[in-house]
Amino acid sequence: MNHSPNQSRPVSIMRRFLDSESAGGVSLMVAAALALIVANSPFSQAYFDILHTHIGPLSLTDWINDALMAVFFLLVGLEIKREFLDGQLASWPNRMLPGIAAAGGVILPAIIFTAFNWHDPAKVRGWAVPSATDIAFALGVLSLLGSRVPSSLKVFLATLAILDDLAAVVIIAIFYTAEISMPYLGGAFAAAIVLFVMNRMGVMKLLPYLIGGAALWFFVLNSGVHATVAGVVTALMIPLKAAPGRPDDMTSPLHVLEHALAKPVAFIIVPIFGFANAGISFAGLDASVMRDTLTLGIMLGLFIGKQLGVFGAAWLAIKTGLAQKPLGATWIQLYGVAVLCGIGFTMSIFIGLLSFPSDLMQAETKIGVLAGSGLSAICGYILLRLVTKPKNT
């Protein structure tokens, strides 16, 4: 059966996306492991001193979390827009299974975390920490299985993680906003309106959008809303079409910017974030940290809540006819992928940093995230390896 170029192009886009993200996941794993080693070595003090060094108005850690991660969210926004308008999420039938599964994977971990921490208002602020899936890390683990896993499951995991990221962006914007500065918020709205007008007027040069996005980031940073939201808003204003009324092609501003950012984000920005934020010094910490409700809520929310929430919601959607099971996938394979959804790392640590100001609570958050993500990665990988066989080529 012959396929037109337009029919095959979204698949090739997703394949390139998967390749980039899975390779980036390996880089993230290495960066996180290196951070843990350095933070517990004779170089520990130098590591933390460098991260707290001020460069202009912000510390190095703040530049990473507020500026570099805004670029990460810019790429996330570009991927979300492309997938909704021209990719795997362009039709409602394709959105149903990952959408329902993503909702289950956000709600149940939050319930489990809250059940452990409802008695402490300071801790319950972190309810969203175990609700995220790290797309790079999860696809990195999945890539280690090669041809054992049907491509439909890789697409399912990628689209679910994209919707998960969208939920995280909304959660950050609504629930993790500090005291609002109305003048700066007004400036942010003005910058967003300028970007919108440029889009409607058919401006096809990237530079004006990047300048407008930088202005938007400055205003959002000082408004009290987290600066990374600026990255997503900017992405949504960048045109997907090469010209108004023309079919989409790879020369459109969105495709050009997405292609330019994919590898720097996967191999530079995300590993830098992992190296800067995964470093936990275990000096002074004892076994009681693992029994703390904050650590347990995050760890079990990721490891238990994610897999049960994702798989349970997917099973219900398929059994009720709301969605179809991924082509060529078995129930146990779908469950294995649901286990991998408990790898929260980047977004979970990021939300944890927004939730808790104290060093101890941040350390407990990171331990919970690392434990829950590690268990999910190991168990998901072992399960999928045991129940699948590589395809003969």
From Swiss-Prot:
Its membrane topology: Multi-pass membrane protein
InterPro entries: Na/H_antiporter_dom_sf (IPR023171), NhaA (IPR004670)
Reaction(s) this enzyme catalyzes, per UniProt: Na(+)(in) + 2 H(+)(out) = Na(+)(out) + 2 H(+)(in)
Family matches, as Pfam families: Na_H_antiport_1
Recorded coiled-coil stretches: none
Subcellular location: Cell inner membrane
GO BP annotation list: regulation of pH
Keyword Nucleotide-binding: no
Entry function: Na(+)/H(+) antiporter that extrudes sodium in exchange for external protons.
Name under which the protein is recorded: Na(+)/H(+) antiporter NhaA 1
